[in-house]
């Protein structure tokens, strides 16, 4: 008997992600979990399903590993690009390490060169990177800034592993601290630096430090606006991806607790890589692993009885390319029926 049968049908929620397709107000979907559990495959597959019911869908990778290009067999960059074979599904990969440099360059060039050769660019960059989590915060802010200028009906984030994702979601607080520190430095040294820069011809594009700080304040306002949307369950949800093992389950529980503390909705869990050996299977390892997985599946059912829990099988081939992703995505909507155990 499968673990699904251990929960009464009338008490259990639909074991699919169909509810996300039916929620027409949904604008932001985050897909996250521990490394190596199938986040990218799940986010790509969900994007494919959403593209069937929405006018325009954007899939964004904020994971430094960037697996979207590998999943679809197509190169993506920091500009949104239509995915081959689709008319309304685009993808982009943001480099989390590039956004602060881009912002602080503020007029062209890199590092010291962009600050008139005075080393101020390096100083500002070091200051920014010295604040814990600011890299995640700023890269996320840059993503939002780009997304805000585009017109997509729903946006899916293929996020970095759990720790990075949770820091991403704390970015408003982190950015406030960064801005406060920069404002303090500007008050203390701004007139002197502007005077020195004036003698050296100023910053590229005729900007000054006040203009840079003004840009950062504008960025903060964008973040505040989108952050309000993130806390609206009608607009935003987080899909947790895990496997039926202790560490993954532990990470998922920690993530759900943190998401709840941030007031971000989460009600869907995708459990990947499940083994379903047939009744006559002679694979002892498969049976032993299935026994372990059933134990953790039971725990998931007990812990998250008010969640949509989707069970996905371990496949014999890698899920890469449009065809295989489409096949995998169907199982997110139409539950996989395992062989009789």
Curated annotation (Swiss-Prot):
The top EC class is hydrolase
- Which cellular component, as a GO term, is one annotated location? GET complex
Q: Which InterPro entries match?
A: Anion-transp_ATPase-like_dom, ATPase_ArsA/GET3, ATPase_ArsA/GET3_euk, P-loop_NTPase
Q: Localized where? A: Cytoplasm; Endoplasmic reticulum
Q: What is its EC number?
A: 3.6.-.-
Residues forming the catalytic site: 63
For biological process, the GO terms are: cellular response to oxidative stress; pheromone-dependent signal transduction involved in conjugation with cellular fusion; post-translational protein targeting to endoplasmic reticulum membrane; response to heat; response to metal ion; retrograde vesicle-mediated transport, Golgi to endoplasmic reticulum; tail-anchored membrane protein insertion into ER membrane
Q: What does this protein do?
A: ATPase required for the post-translational delivery of tail-anchored (TA) proteins to the endoplasmic reticulum. Recognizes and selectively binds the transmembrane domain of TA proteins in the cytosol. This complex then targets to the endoplasmic reticulum by membrane-bound receptors, where the tail-anchored protein is released for insertion. This process is regulated by ATP binding and hydrolysis. ATP binding drives the homodimer towards the closed dimer state, facilitating recognition of newly synthesized TA membrane proteins. ATP hydrolysis is required for insertion.
In terms of HAMAP family, this protein maps to: Asna1_Get3
Q: How does it assemble?
A: Homodimer.
- Can you tell me which family this protein belongs to? Belongs to the arsA ATPase family.
Read off the PANTHER family from this record.
Answer: ARSENICAL PUMP-DRIVING ATPASE ARSENITE-TRANSLOCATING ATPASE, ATPASE GET3
Instruction: Return the NCBIfam families for the record.
Output: GET3_arsA_TRC40 (TIGR00345)
Q: What is this protein called?
A: ATPase GET3
What is the organism of origin for this protein?
Paracoccidioides brasiliensis (strain Pb18)
Q: Which gene encodes it?
A: GET3
């Amino acid at each position: 008997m499968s673990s699904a049968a251990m929960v009464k049908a009338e008490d259990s929620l639909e074991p699919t992600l169909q509810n996300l397709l039916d929620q027409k107000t949904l604008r932001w979907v985050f897909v996250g979990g521990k490394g190596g559990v199938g986040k990218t495959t799940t986010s790509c597959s969900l994007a494919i399903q959403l593209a069937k019911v929405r006018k325009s869908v954007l899939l964004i990778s904020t994971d430094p590993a960037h697996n979207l290009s590998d999943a679809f067999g197509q190169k993506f960059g920091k500009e949104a690009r239509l995915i081959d074979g689709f008319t309304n599904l685009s993808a982009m990969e943001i480099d989390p390490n590039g956004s602060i440099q881009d912002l602080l360059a503020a007029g062209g060039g890199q590092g010291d060169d962009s600050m008139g050769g005075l080393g101020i660019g390096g100083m500002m960059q070091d200051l920014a990177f010295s604040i814990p989590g600011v890299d995640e915060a700023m890269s996320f802010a840059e993503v939002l800034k780009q997304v805000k200028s585009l017109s997509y009906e729903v946006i899916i984030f293929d996020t970095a592993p759990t720790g990075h994702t949770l820091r991403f979601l704390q970015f408003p607080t982190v950015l406030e601290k960064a801005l406060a520190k920069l404002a303090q430095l500007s008050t203390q040294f701004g007139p002197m630096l502007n005077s020195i820069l004036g003698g050296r011809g100023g910053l590229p594009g005729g900007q000054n430090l006040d203009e840079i700080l003004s840009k950062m304040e504008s960025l903060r306002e964008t973040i505040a606006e989108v952050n309000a949307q993130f806390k609206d369950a009608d607009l935003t949800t987080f899909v947790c991806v895990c496997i039926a093992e202790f560490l993954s389950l532990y990470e998922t529980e920690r993530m759900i607790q943190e998401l709840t503390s941030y007031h971000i909705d989460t009600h869907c869990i995708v459990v990947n890589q499940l083994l379903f050996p047939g009744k006559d299977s002679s694979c002892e390892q498969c049976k032993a692993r299935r026994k372990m997985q059933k134990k953790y599946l039971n725990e998931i059912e007990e812990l998250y009885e008010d969640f949509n829990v989707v069970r996905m099988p371990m496949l014999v081939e890698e899920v890469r390319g449009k065809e295989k992703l489409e096949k995998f995505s169907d199982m997110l909507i139409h539950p996989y029926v395992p062989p009789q155990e």
